[in-house]
């Protein structure tokens, strides 16, 4: 059972019995109580969610800390395959996507995200050292909503994140 199905079942049970305990939900749904607790916490987290897909751990960690300090819920993925998987399971509000990664590069990740009906509406900001005009054009033509080159100004990146989230809500 995936997270969305689990969430739907939990909400259905809570609608039937608002006083039910986590233990009661775990018994009814035949799952470990830790799974119930994780889904309940997830349901109550209303912060905007950002998925960062980057194989450079130091850069990812620094950016994660900076965005979390602004109140974002930040999820991380270290390669393209994990990025697609987390996009499906976590449904972020925006994805920050590096291009140069092993296994599957960011262009291919973006193409797959934008061709998946479940994920195509999630804004993607390419965040990469590839700053040539042809790279920018390719990223934007793949469906990226914005393109920021490394090194970047954190204040500008935060403004761009707010902008794509705002455009996506309207």
Q: What is each stretch, according to the model?
A:
Residues 76-85, 106:
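Helix N-cap/capping motif at the beta->alpha junctions
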Residues 85, 107-120:
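Short amphipathic alpha-helix used as the core "switch/output" element in two-component signaling
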Residues 101:
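Receiver (REC) domain active-site loop signature in two-component systems and cognate sites
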Residues 54, 98, 128:
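Active-site residues of response regulator receiver
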Residues 5-8, 108, 131-148:
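Alpha4 helix (beta4-alpha4-beta5 surface) of REC/receiver domains from two-component response regulators
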Residues 47-58, 63-67:
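Conserved acidic segment of CheY-like receiver
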Residues 152-162:
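C-terminal output helix
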Residues 44-45, 90-96:
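Active-site beta3 strand of CheY-like receiver
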């Amino acid at each position: 059972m995936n997270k969305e199905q689990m969430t739907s079942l939990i909400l259905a049970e809570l609608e039937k019995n608002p006083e039910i305990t986590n233990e009661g939900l775990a018994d009814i749904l035949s799952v470990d109580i830790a799974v119930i607790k994780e889904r309940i916490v997830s349901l109550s987290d209303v912060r905007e969610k950002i998925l960062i897909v980057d194989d450079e751990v130091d850069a990812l960690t620094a950016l994660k800390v900076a965005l979390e300090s602004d109140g974002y819920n930040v999820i991380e993925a270290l390669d393209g395959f994990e990025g697609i998987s987390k996009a499906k399971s976590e449904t972020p509000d925006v994805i920050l996507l590096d291009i140069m990664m092993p296994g599957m590069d960011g262009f291919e990740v973006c193409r797959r995200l934008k061709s998946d009906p479940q994920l195509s509406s999630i804004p993607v900001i390419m965040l990469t050292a590839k700053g040539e005009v042809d790279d920018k054009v390719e990223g934007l033509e793949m469906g990226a909503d914005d393109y920021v080159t490394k090194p970047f100004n954190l204040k500008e990146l935060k403004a761009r994140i707010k902008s794509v989230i705002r455009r996506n809500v309207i």
